Amino acid sequence: MPSGRVVGRTRPIATGSTGERRLLSPALLIAVLVVGGIVVLSAVLIGSPASPYACASQLQPQANATVENPIVTPDEGAGHVRTGTTTEYASCPPASGPHYTEGGGVAPLRPAFYDSGARIGPANWVHNLEHGYVVALYRCPDGQCPSNDVLSELREFVLNGPPTESATACGVSSKVLAARFDDMATPFALVAWDRVLLLDTFDAQVGIDFARRWLEQPELAERGSC
């Protein structure tokens, strides 16, 4: 954890209960869905509790933030921690910081749309950010998720993410994914390493434009990794 250690946590989240036993071999269940005539992948991580985490605060929207000039967050490092460790972040949604490194589609995650029941958290997808991914996040407060039309926009974003050389080398169409994350001030967010764009609405083209700008940032040591 970097020098600004988390203190006075607001609404700390620890979603993996202590009484829950983790299966030895978590699996990624991939389903092929047809949404509005478009075939998309939907993923659910099963056999593993959601990654526990804690945030000192929620990142707040900035009126002048755009795709080209999103919120720049302080770099919290890229430390690898053991799966199941509670990871701590200065703000949520995090755009850097400690994360799991289990592999096998657990951390980093495979590029896909993850439905609201997927048992994942920042410690999973922050590893994707380190590898140059862009992650779209959606919120389901009190279980009230976005409408099917909006979820279709998120799936379209995943389906049409910009290609990169490393994505091709990794055997995927694009290094983007979408996942539920409730601990944020707006219904949606687009996240790259140290970059966050908080959104009240989600449009697939905005997500694609953000990804085109911020995928595979050259300063990332592991940007070519899968």
Predicted feature residues:
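Helix-rich interaction surfaces within compact, conserved domain-sized segments
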Residues: F157-C226
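Terminal targeting segments of Actinobacterial cell-envelope proteins
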Residues: M1-L24
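Hydrophobic, helix-length membrane anchors
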Residues: L45-A50
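Mid-length scaffold segments of soluble, non-membrane domains
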Residues: A112-T168
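Surface-exposed, low-hydrophobicity interaction/linker segments
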Residues: S51, S57-N124, P146
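Ordered hydrophobic segments in well-structured contexts
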Residues: E88, V126, Y133-L137, K175-A179, ...
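Hydrophobic membrane-insertion alpha-helices, especially the h-region
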Residues: A27-V44
